[in-house]
Amino acid sequence: MASSNTYSNFKLATELPAWSKLQKLYDAQGKSLNVKEEFQKDSARYNKYAKTLTNYDGSKILFDFSKNLINDEILATLIELAKEAKVTDLRDAMFAGEHINFTEDRAVYHVALRNRANKPMKVDGVDVAPEVDAVLQHMKEFSEQVRSGEWKGYTGKKITDVVNIGIGGSDLGPVMVTEALKHYAGVLDVHFVSNIDGTHIAEVLKVVDPETTLFLVASKTFTTAETITNANTAKNWFLSKTGNDQSNIAKHFAALSTNETEVAKFGIDTKNMFGFENWVGGRYSVWSAIGLSVALYIGFDNFEAFLKGAEAVDKHFVETPLEDNIPLLGGLLSVWYNNFFGAQTHLVAPFDQYLHRFPAYLQQLSMESNGKSVTRGNVFSTYSTGSILFGEPATNAQHSFFQLVHQGTKLIPSDFILAAQSHNPIENNLHQKMLASNFFAQAEALMVGKDEAQVKSEGATGGLVPHKIFSGNRPTTSILAQKITPAALGSLIAYYEHVTFTEGAIWNINSFDQWGVELGKVLAKVIGKELDNTEKITAHDASTNGLINQFKEWL
């Protein structure tokens, strides 16, 4: 139900008894805990801390938490913290459609988008499942028409290329998913335009044919400045190539939006408008109509498998006891490192080239959600919140920033992701086995390190010795899937969504607004008008004035 901030009575994390207990455990055990020694002391450690998720199709993903800086007492206290922070209460409120995004008075209901069991899911007393299903059915019909060639351009030719124009969640999700599931691609090529930099759309328009290109304009309000500017540029280009006949637009443009008036004004047939509700946040929107480019690219059946994979993790997150709840454990470990070890970053390194955009996607999910300094009690936090998430695919990353991870002065908790089965098992799986050997070796090396005696035994002497020492004891979580399928990818994304949720619930912040993006947009509108004339600018600080005036001189 709609309400004011009903979550302000949730306590600050530092007020919880388990928080103080964890601080004492960190001082007494955590900061000196040696994972290599923990394995020597406890032969069951791996079996205790490795958890397996079974997907809806029977496939599995293994999450190995055993190389983390925890023991049974620390883990039990972290779970105690989750209970005291009422993580499950907030989780249940989210799944019940309550307005847990209280600053915008909205439900947070992206989980309803992957409700393929079609169970009733209500917001403000209204079951949204039929509406979600209707949009999906519309997406299915449209995507199958385009993919089959039944849908034709204005000259009667089949569509060959799809250009998705969006930004933020309307871009990052579809870009990442289409790259990750490229193996499942069909007859269409997809392109993405997001940046207001004219180079982005110019380079795409160079390689597409107006007779065979479908543009998807992805903006819930149909007023997002960057998206509408790019969409108008695409429309002007299209009209200039097609005799300026406005009626041709309907065959080549569709809208992922809810603003019927603006969509119609643009020239798009509102029959080709795919909507989604305000309870779908941008960074959670790939499951919605925003995923139309994905459905066009990989086919609707694969898109539905993607949804079902996420649904399987939702079910696990809701039904599994805290001790075995995989996303909850991932979130608790993040809090442990952030707030007790002082770790500021979180590395996600997929050992899979198809997942090369996965870290960029997770950056928005994590940092836009939990980059907050005000709690649900409307006071500034006195403790650290969101981590700086970064990553690149390995093994490339090993030849760039892994030096810092292994021998730098900062603790960088890391997630490594690998699929056992490659979609491209070339050279009799030679490449895959080399990739896997690095996946296992990097996690092992970060844990065991190399001490002075080992370095000397290898022949190093004098001042060279300390340079070759690896301290080890650097935490990793290894995530091993059977194969990167649509279902597996859906599960991985949902895992990180619920990790992010758990972090925010512990920190007592609203993970579902993003006020931090607003100020820059407001100021940009003011400055944009100043760039339309030749007058010298003096209205800002000296630095901003100087930069604007130099730009105008050089433009």
Curated annotation (Swiss-Prot):
One annotated Gene Ontology cellular component of this protein: mitochondrion
Q: Which GO terms describe its molecular function?
A: carbohydrate derivative binding; glucose-6-phosphate isomerase activity; monosaccharide binding
Database matches in Gene3D superfamilies: 1.10.1390.10, Glucose-6-phosphate isomerase like protein, domain 1
SUPFAM superfamilies reported in the protein's UniProt record: SIS domain
Q: What Enzyme Commission number(s) apply to this enzyme? A: 5.3.1.9
Q: Does the keyword Signal apply?
A: no
**Location of the protein in the cell:** Cytoplasm, Cytosol
Where is D-glucose 6-phosphate bound in this sequence?
G169, S170, S219, K220, T221, F222, T223, T224, Q364, E368, H399, K521
Q: Which domain of life is it from?
A: Eukaryota
Q: Which reactions are catalysed by this chain? A: alpha-D-glucose 6-phosphate = beta-D-fructose 6-phosphate
The record's section on InterPro entries has: G6P_Isomerase, G6P_Isomerase_C, Phosphoglucose_isomerase_CS, SIS_dom_sf, SIS_PGI_1, SIS_PGI_2
- Report if keyword Repeat is assigned: no
Q: Which UniProt keywords apply?
A: Cytoplasm, Gluconeogenesis, Glycolysis, Isomerase
User: Coiled coil located at which positions?
Assistant: none
Catalytic center residues: E368 (proton donor), H399, K521
Instruction: Describe its function.
Output: In the cytoplasm, catalyzes the conversion of glucose-6-phosphate to fructose-6-phosphate, the second step in glycolysis, and the reverse reaction during gluconeogenesis.
Q: How does it assemble?
A: Homodimer.
Q: Indicate what this protein is called per its UniProt record.
A: Glucose-6-phosphate isomerase
Gene assigned in the entry: PGI1
